[in-house]
A protein has these predicted regions:
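Specific transmembrane alpha-helical segments of multi-pass solute transporters/efflux pumps
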Residues: 23-28, 56-105, 113, 141, ...
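Glycine-/small-residue-enriched transmembrane alpha-helix faces in small-molecule transporters
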Residues: 1-45, 147-174, 195-196
Length: 293
């Protein structure tokens, strides 16, 4: 491959990664719109039913099936990914603003790095600990927004969902060693959707179908765009560029989510929101460069 072809390949890979980051960022906006007419369990169920239906045929086409010995791990990771992460996250999103929810989710990389140092023995140097401290302070500033009350439960639920993120990120490393990324993701989301279905039906009953066009469009974008397409784009891009460069694009999620919350939804913000957001994104950026942490 000559230099020009290599540069073109890098450009396409980085475009894919940036697109995935943006799609994850817009999920907070479309999530808020969907939650205006549906409960969090139904939004999560429909989102990942669509995502599974879009990705699973690819896994089957590639002939990738879970080994029997890995079924319990797929089931556990699926549960941690869909009900434990996104059901709790959407529940929190229904009680708080998209801006702060997006910024809290931006703390994911430092939190994962912290638990990886505890359970996987991954090195976390001074810059890593500084990033964790900065992200913690950033969340404290971001949630203390002006003119908003009764948002603490929602903020706490979104933060709680990040503990589930830690679980499935660390456990999915085992699956990543034995399965291609996109087929593994397809099976994880499928198992996760199956574990969510009884919870959603018991909690909120049968999903309504008499929804507005905006709500249906939001659900479709959440399932096909923010889940299926985003995961496929991310896995394709991350296989073609160094991990330290790929991780930078994760910072688009909190940035895009927070900006849309302010500009489109008109959510309250202030200097503390900006400073808190900057600390969170900066901390995630530091952790993205794992070799220097």
């Amino acid at each position: 491959m000559d230099t020009t072809e290599g540069q073109a390949s890098d450009w396409f890979a980085m475009t894919a990664l940036a697109s995935a980051g943006v799609l994850w960022g817009v999920s907070f906006l479309f999530g808020k719109w969907a939650l205006e007419e549906m409960g969090p369990a139904h939004v999560t169920l429909l989102r990942f039913s669509l995502a599974s239906a879009a990705l699973l045929p690819y896994a089957l086409l590639k002939g990738v099936w879970p080994w029997w010995r890995d079924l319990p791990l797929f089931l556990l990771v699926g549960f941690l990914t869909v009900p434990a992460t996104f059901l709790i996250q959407f529940w929190g999103l229904s009680l708080t603003g998209a801006t702060v929810a997006a910024l809290i989710v931006g703390c994911g990389p430092p939190i994962v790095a912290f638990f990886a140092s505890l359970f996987l023995g991954e090195r976390l140097g001074k810059r890593g600990w500084s990033a964790i401290g900065a992200s913690t302070l950033g969340v404290a500033l971001a949630v203390a927004r002006p003119g908003v009350s009764n948002h603490w439960l929602g903020d706490a639920l979104v933060l709680l969902s990040l503990l589930a993120v830690v679980g499935w990120v660390l456990l999915s490393k085992r699956l990543g060693d034995r399965y291609p990324a996109v087929p593994a993701t397809a099976w994880i989301l499928t198992f996760g959707t199956v574990t969510l279905a009884p919870v959603a039906l018991l909690w909120e009953g049968v999903p309504r179908l008499d929804l507005t066009l905006l709500c249906w469009a939001s659900v479709l974008i959440l399932g096909l765009g923010c889940s299926a397409a985003a995961y496929a784009l991310w896995n394709w891009g991350v296989a073609r560029v160094p991990a330290s460069r790929a991780g930078i694009f994760l910072n688009l999620e909190p940035l895009v989510g927070a900006l849309l919350g302010i500009l489109v939804l008109g959510e309250a913000w202030g200097p503390a929101t900006i400073v808190g957001g900057a600390l969170i994104v900066g901390a995630a950026l530091v952790v993205s460069h794992r070799s220097s942490v």
